[in-house]
């Protein structure tokens, strides 16, 4: 089952290739295996409620999503991928009021204080249920980003405990932020006989660093910044804070279900890129919200996407690609200026039974191969932009 084909890049400086993923990696000779392989999940959004629709009318399969995640985990384990990237929204915001959406809460649990919020809640239990579904994957680490839907159910502190996101408090700031990196030091598979390999660094961004969600209305400077951004750019705010009605083009990103990246995180990102360059590593950037304005619907972009994009372009000699979720239909663009690939992955939530939507990514020295399952589009992304930067790094 395939969605409409992604737009292919048109920049003549780079090769244009697209391959289907019908060939199994198990048939590939040992010396012709990718250096790294990992799994990708996006927008599971499980909730213990009947199937429904988004606010714009798209069908959503809340309970099937959990079973699709279970199948994906078994498949990831079978192929022994080195890690799995969850691009956020592991549960749906409707967990906060399941009875409104046709779900039920056991009367005994109600009497014990079980509700739509708090430490004893549907949201907490729903995340536990999805983590149990993913528990069959044991070959490597499960790297989580978080999105708006997690914050409709849990605090950042609770998410840190549940998802092992290493939230920190920035200097001179008591507010939690959840950006981090993870390095695969050794290739899982030998790619060729010359032994020329590199370490792979995953840089996981917190795109809800500046936002309204789970930030104290009285004391949070980040919430204050979010309030000022939305007040300036969206006349629907605050009465209809999630509405882009009347907004045009890129301005449609200024809604409350999005967020931004604060200065300390931008500085951290720059330092992480410098470190990768100095150590001869290559980088894949992961975030819930998309970074490039042509890689998804504009209503899903990071508020200050341009600040992040500027850093990515500066270090395009090390950045292979940027992967995100949030925009459920998916999308893709190759940045004309840098050659970096920006891919938004299709949501698991919107695939009906028996379709299970997720992806494998195989990392070769000269290309990334996305092997899409279900409604996830497959493609091959050439890494010839790395070749074009050879000898020019010292000028940056």
Model-found features: residue ranges?
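Short acidic, glycine-rich surface-loop motifs adjacent to enzyme active sites
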Residues: 273-294
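Extended active-site neighborhood of metal-dependent phosphoesterases/phosphodiesterases
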Residues: 11-14, 28-30, 56-59, 95-277, ...
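N-terminal active-site segment of His-dependent metallophosphoesterases
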Residues: 2-123
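Active-site glycine-centered loops adjacent to acidic/histidine catalytic or metal-binding residues
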Residues: 43, 88-89, 147-148, 205, ...
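Histidine-centered catalytic micro-motifs
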Residues: 285-291, 320-330
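Short, solvent-exposed loop/turn segments at secondary-structure junctions
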Residues: 48, 93-95, 99, 292-295, ...
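Residue-level marker for buried hydrophobic side chains located in beta-strands
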Residues: 38-40, 84-86, 144, 285, ...
